[in-house]
Amino acid sequence: MQVPLLDLKAQYATIKNEILAAVTEVLESQRCIGGPKVAELEEKIAAISDCKFAVGVSSGTDAILNSLMSLDIGVGDEVITTSFTFFATVGCIARAGAKPVFVDIDSKTFNINPELIETAVTKKTKAIMPVHLFGQMADMDPIMKVANKYNLAVIEDAAQSITSTYKGRKAGSIGTVGCFSFFPSKNLGGIGDGGMIVTNDEHLYERLLVMRNHGQVSSYSYKYVGANFRLDPIQAVALLVKLPHLDKWTEARRHNAAYYDKKFTGTVVQTPYISADCASIYNQYVIRVPKRDEVVAHLQENNIGCNVYYPVPLHLQECFRHLGYKEDDLAESEKAAKEVMALPIYPELTDKMQDYTVKTILEFFQ
């Protein structure tokens, strides 16, 4: 049996005709930049995120970068964040000219440990960037308490967590801005790159709109130095086709996660810990196991897809060496990087595929 880590073709087969019709409509109109479909998607993403405003952008990475630039965060500023995340979180801070300041993660959720944030605040701190990793939101109340105390912006990196909740509140709706990714592997994935910024701040919303189009405020008149962060209408129409299915697909992921949880009960496999305050959307199903690299190799030998998110925390990456971090500085992040691995969790996964995956893992430890 073969079990891919992700099977986008299986999802596409269920909506193929709708996708083709929607994309064809854009091509025939030749309205290939901006337009009503982008605006419609923005309105709908704002609604499902319980936010007033949304700005479509070219990727989740650009959602973060535009947010930083629109908040005037740059050279001389510091942004507190996590090292155990995808590169874009921290890469954007550096690209904006600011300095990333790392704090360690909670060992159970893998999200930033809010108890460590306040001690990292300095006179140069301008923002906190929590990451809602793998589909579960960070512990936002204590993060917002620190942010409010020191007048800091909060940029929610919600790339992996669209519609996930914390105490009933949606990802992206609690901080200053929320940043989503529509990379094809996401719960709501496009047919290429795409992203979205949500906010309840009207002034910031207007700035984000201007910044995504080079900083232009009227024809060939530029108030700011922005960039081309625009979302293509082809991506917008594909996402509009998928959006009505999102809740169903997310519930299927939750069903698959519960199935794994039950099968791994009482074994050496440590299943995902989901806080009682959170409802995860399970963009990834990440387990912890001893001898992780050997388990990964064993699964691959048995035609089961898996991956490691993330094998090297960002504070130990060569490009951030100048920041002065060394091994053992962020013990929980480094420990997680050596023990975690992601299993297939997509909605079309069958019980038989999950049974084979569980059986193969447990056989390794016999």
Over which residues does each language-model region extend?
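Hydrophobic/aromatic ligand-binding patch that stacks against planar heteroaromatic rings
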Residues: 91-93, 146, 170, 187, ...
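Conserved active-site segment immediately N-terminal to the catalytic lysine
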Residues: 156-191, 218-223
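Structural detector of well-ordered beta-strand residues that form the stable sheet scaffold
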Residues: 55, 80, 101, 153-155, ...
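N-terminal "arm"/small-domain region of PLP-dependent enzymes with the aminotransferase-like
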Residues: 1-31, 36
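Short beta-strand-to-turn element immediately C-terminal to the catalytic PLP-Schiff-base lysine
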Residues: 180-181, 195-200, 240
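PLP-dependent aminotransferase-like
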Residues: 69-158, 165, 364
